[in-house]
A protein has these predicted regions:
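Bacterial N-terminal signal peptides that target proteins for export
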Residues: 2-13
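N-terminal signal peptide c-region/cleavage motif recognized by signal peptidases
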Residues: 22-25
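Compact, glycine-rich, soluble single-domain proteins
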Residues: 28-159
Length: 159
């Protein structure tokens, strides 16, 4: 049996994995925030939210790390391929945030206040596909809580 093709494929796969890890690690250690992600407009009742969309693995992994500030009407929407119990931490995140764990129909399942640089996990109460991070206090100041609805393109019914 010729193992050369298997070894070659294994080495290529390992090289690709290491390159991805290196790219992500360099972005995180460089201390550069992600500022050029695609954007979409969401609404929470009468309130407009300008969100960056982190839909790819490496975008979700970096999230809002290294940001020193964020305008009050802005946030980041994390989009996962499938609903699941999503857990977030605040490694390298310098601003206090609240994570809204959001179901496919836009209903907020639960909220979690998160402190800067805290590496404790904050998880969804049930499987969700979306997590919306906003400045801490934004949801509370607008009386938006679990059961409230977020609307916008990501939450439109799928055919």
């Amino acid at each position: 049996m010729n193992t050369l093709p298997y070894r070659l494929v294994a080495r290529l796969a390992l090289s690709a994995a290491l390159a991805t890890t290196t790219f992500t690690s360099q972005a995180q250690t460089a201390g550069e925030p992600q500022l050029n992600l695609p954007r979409t407009e969401l609404r929470a009742g009468m309130y407009r939210i300008d969100t960056q969309v982190a839909a790819r693995f490496h975008e979700r992994q970096i999230g809002l790390m290294h940001r020193k500030s964020m305008p009050q009407h802005e946030g980041m929407l994390f989009v996962f391929e499938q609903p699941g119990v999503q857990c977030f931490w605040m490694k390298n995140t310098l601003i206090p945030l609240t994570a809204a764990f959001v179901a496919d129909d836009g209903t907020i399942v639960n909220l979690a206040d998160m402190q800067p640089l805290d590496e404790a996990s904050h998880c969804s109460a049930k499987p969700v596909r979306y997590v919306l991070e906003m400045n801490q206090g934004w949801f509370k100041s607008k009386n938006i809580q679990a059961g409230s609805k977020i609307s916008g393109a990501p939450f439109q019914p799928r055919p």
